[in-house]
Design a protein with these regions (language model features):
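Acidic/His-rich, metal-assisted hydrolase cores and their charged scaffolds
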Residues: 1-176
Length: 176
């Protein structure tokens, strides 16, 4: 995706799932698994997810499994890394879509029914360079499910938006 100039948009549940995905992304970056794009930016654009992440960071002894706790004992925070940017304000959120560099955007809601993810979908679904990566269950009747089921077009903010981005699901992370 990055090689073709695209971005990865991840609709994510704000509490728990976002932090789990940050953990995976930190490992990907640390291991250099995205060749030629080591310094890519990861945006977390959800006030609730940002606050939940702060709780995880501030209460590390209680929030992590043994593998993550071992990292903490080595002085490594398992969900904080270089290139991680949080967008708390509306202005910061809007600025993400003005950044034309390849990037990862984690935003709520996970099923795309509300929240800032809808703006990111509007700005990114039409572009075949991008990937929308679902990391959780998508209930019937939700926008997320429509995308996973192969919708050619969706309605966002009163406008029809063509679905040209690649739609993918990451198996094994849903709680369902």
């Amino acid at each position: 995706t990055f090689d073709r100039g695209g971005s990865v948009i991840i609709p994510s549940f704000a509490v728990g799932r976002t932090q789990e995905i940050l953990y995976f992304i930190r490992q990907i970056k640390e291991r250099g698994m995205v060749k030629g794009h080591d310094g890519f930016t990861v945006y977390v654009d959800s006030p609730l997810a940002i606050n939940a992440t702060k709780i995880f960071v501030d209460n590390a002894a209680y929030c992590y499994d043994e593998e993550a706790a071992a990292l903490l004992r080595q002085g490594v925070n398992p969900i904080v890394f270089d290139g991680l940017v949080t967008a708390s304000s509306v202005q910061e959120s809007m600025a993400i879509n003005a950044d034309d560099r390849p990037k990862v955007i984690l935003s709520a809601s996970g099923m795309c029914e509300g929240g800032r993810i809808r703006h990111h979908l509007k700005h990114n679904l039409w572009d075949p360079k991008n990937v929308i990566l679902f990391v959780g269950y998508q209930a019937v009747g939700t926008l997320g499910r429509s995308l996973v089921d192969g919708a050619d077009e969706v309605r966002l903010f009163g406008e029809e938006v063509a679905v040209r981005a690649e739609i993918l699901q990451l198996p094994g992370v849903s709680g369902h």
